[in-house]
Design a protein with these regions (language model features):
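Catalytic-core "active-site belt" of small-molecule-metabolizing enzymes
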Residues: 1-151, 158-188
Length: 188
């Protein structure tokens, strides 16, 4: 199982391994070599049919559930060389379940709210989410064979700083369709 990610403002995609998927809403403990944790809000879909080079006409047949979550990135110490952000840290892909029926994205008025615990509230209106997801499924399937159970995630905003080592501990909560979908602490 892969988590295929389309970064914000980029036409290419990359894969995160399944070890990055956080299923149980547990607290995130940062590795010692990471000085900062950044996050990017995402909308994601679960692939329900294997395929390659999926066409726009048939893309709705290839996913059966959607959701909202966040991807965590680690900013390494300066000694790590040319790495800007680390995307393969275990349990750093917060893609909660249960998933929603894709029909919820059709009205374009659903809101994904994130509270970072630092008096910062982020509200994202998902007006183009269905189009973004379907475009990402089509474009990523040109490079990667989709398998049943894969996730395709699209970053809705550029990654931003969540916490630094000096912050110690920060909480993060997310709501979608007026339901709390995740809540955890990031401990540096």
């Amino acid at each position: 199982m892969n988590i295929i990610v389309k970064p914000y403002g980029n036409d290419l995609c990359y894969c995160r391994p399944d070890t990055t998927w956080e299923r149980e809403n547990r607290d995130f403990y940062s590795p010692e070599c990471v000085n900062e944790i950044h996050f990017a809000p995402v909308v994601f879909a679960r692939v329900s049919k294997a395929g390659k080079c999926v066409g726009k006409k048939f893309v709705e047949r290839y996913y059966d559930g959607i959701g909202c979550g966040v991807l965590l990135y680690g900013a390494p110490e300066a000694s790590c060389g040319s790495c800007r952000l680390i995307s393969h840290i275990d349990r750093s892909s917060i893609l909660p379940s249960p998933l929603y029926n894709p029909v919820v994205l059709e009205d374009g008025e659903k809101v994904f709210d994130i509270n970072t615990g630092k008096d910062e509230q982020i509200s994202i209106v998902l007006e183009q989410a269905k189009t973004l997801l379907e475009d990402a499924i089509c474009s990523s399937s040109e490079l990667i064979s989709l398998r049943i159970g894969d996730f395709v995630a699209v970053e809705l905003e550029p990654a931003r700083l969540l916490a630094g080592r000096a912050d110690g501990e920060v909480s993060m909560k997310g709501t979608f369709c007026e339901n709390e979908i995740f809540g955890f602490k990031v401990i540096l």
